[in-house]
From Swiss-Prot:
Biological or metabolic pathway of the protein: Protein modification; protein ubiquitination
Subcellular location: Nucleus, Nucleolus
Organism superkingdom: Eukaryota
Region annotated Disordered, chain positions: 411-434
SMART domains to which the protein is assigned, alphabetical: WD40
Organism: Danio rerio
Protein name as annotated: DDB1- and CUL4-associated factor 13
Coiled coil: none
Predominant place of localization: nucleus
Any Pfam family: Sof1
Length: 445
């Protein structure tokens, strides 16, 4: 007699320990799940709501400065170290995990205009209103030993910015001219000038370190190649740019922070038109810094807010503000791309999360899986009206909201005026300019 017996492998359904979750057999045939999309939509909506509920971006405030913070820089090798300079000439070294100041140096008389770390992380450079460049050891001196700079260079004019080469012992400063310096020499190796009174900012390209760019007082952005004896080209804009930052992943893109409340991303291969115009601030943009991934950047503005922009989008995905925070002077993105540091008028350095709702600390495997699943669901249903409305909603200070409405009315009035002028003029006499073309005056080779 033949008997048919069901035979199952216990490994397919039995838990290894009592703490494991129960194994549930699933059939992924879509015909068996007709309500799969409505269920996913509900989950996406709930995930979006929870994301806004848990959006607590503020992490810590580092206080200790006695004057306005003028500049911040990151340590080249250490994630936990940040160096800041103030308007009273004081430089402080901070330990971020402990949230405390580990060292204080009276570096300059007057403003500290710029700080940069050496590429190996053994020392850092500062420039100030006292016309000096000073190199300081990254390690604090022993107990009772007086704090002295490793090297001091006396310049002929005030320096307004400094940046270090990514691989070699050279650095660049800006003031009345853009100067390339060797660490072993007390005079510049190379100087660039192009009929400009002064420069406000200069940055090396992190990918192509022979390229650098500067912002000038005549509303221009000038590009240089250290292998050449003269500047390459410059683009003149409607208003002055305060500072700029290169994309760390794509060598030919840089973003500049402008006085006209916007940021502009340029491709150095075609400077006639910016690649993207980033609009959301309601006052002058003072600083900008890219994420190490090169996909986003953060901007600091005179309107007392910080905004995070995707590199290819015209509007910000996030805005940070507090009641106590005043005009934001400088901003930096941490090297692990998880945190943002900002320095403002009321003498505080604030630490923010790059993703406002991200949970800090070690996550379990199930937490990671759930977070990734929710992220994909939100991405899948991001254009649905309810999901989009909740994801975009932000609370703004009353002043910022009022200025935003005023700017919107002004832009609409300007657009109507241009339409009326074009309507009552000879066809073709009034050119139709796009938003990107309006802000560039000319490119000089």
């Amino acid at each position: 007699m033949k008997v048919k017996v069901l035979c199952r492998n216990p490994d397919d359904y039995v838990r290894e320990t009592t703490r494991d979750i129960q194994r549930v057999p699933r059939n992924y045939d879509p015909t068996l799940h007709p309500f799969e999309v409505p269920r996913e939509y509900t989950r996406a909506l709930n995930a979006t709501k929870l994301e806004r509920v848990f959006a607590k971006p503020f992490v810590a405030s580092l206080d200790g400065h006695r004057d306005v913070i003028s500049c911040i820089t990151k340590h080249a090798k250490s994630l936990s170290t940040v160096i800041s300079g103030a308007c009273d000439g004081e430089v402080k070294v901070w330990n971020l995990p402990k949230r405390e100041c580990t060292r204080t140096v009276q570096a300059h008389e007057g403003f500290v205009r710029g700080i940069c770390s050496r590429f190996c992380g053994t020392s850092f450079f500062t420039v100030g209103d006292d016309k000096t460049i000073k190199q300081w050891n990254m390690e604090a001196p022993g107990y009772g030993v007086r704090e002295e700079p490793i090297n001091t260079i006396l310049g002929k004019a005030v320096f307004t910015g400094i940046d270090h080469h990514q691989r070699e012992g050279t650095f660049v400063t800006c003031g009345q001219t853009v100067d390339i310096w060797d660490e072993q020499r007390s005079s510049p190796v190379l100087s660039f000038s192009w009929g400009v009174d002064s420069f406000s900012s200069v940055r090396y390209n992190p990918v192509e370190p022979d390229l650098l760019a500067s912002c000038a007082s005549d509303r221009s952005i000038v590009l240089y190649d250290t292998r050449e004896s003269a500047p390459l080209r410059k683009v003149i804009m409607q208003l002055r740019s305060n500072t700029l930052c290169w994309n760390p992943m794509e060598a030919y893109y840089f973003t500049c922070a402008n006085e006209d409340y916007n940021l502009y991303t340029y491709d150095i291969r075609n400077l006639d038109v910016p690649v993207t115009v980033h609009m959301d601030h309601v006052s002058a943009v003072l600083d900008v810094d890219y994420s190490p991934t090169g996909r986003e950047f953060v901007s600091a503005s005179f309107d007392k807010t910080i905004r995070i922009f995707p590199k290819d989008k015209g509007h910000s995905r996030e805005v940070y503000h507090t009641k106590r925070m005043q005009h934001v002077i400088c901003v930096k993105w941490s090297a692990d791309s998880k945190f943002i540091m900002s320095g403002s008028d009321e003498m505080n350095i604030r630490l923010w999360k790059a993703n406002a709702s991200e949970k800090l600390g070690v996550l379990s495997t199930r937490e990671k899986t759930a977070a990734n699943y929710n992220k994909k669901l939100i991405q899948k249903f991001q254009h649905h009206p309810q999901v989009r409305r909740i994801a975009r909603h932000r609370h703004l200070p009353r002043d910022v909201l009022k200025q935003k409405r005023e700017l919107k009315e002004m832009k609409e009035a300007r657009r109507r005026k241009e339409q009326n002028v074009r309507k009552h003029s000879k066809p073709g006499s009034v050119p139709l300019l796009t938003e990107k073309e309006k802000h560039v005056v000319k490119v000089v080779e």
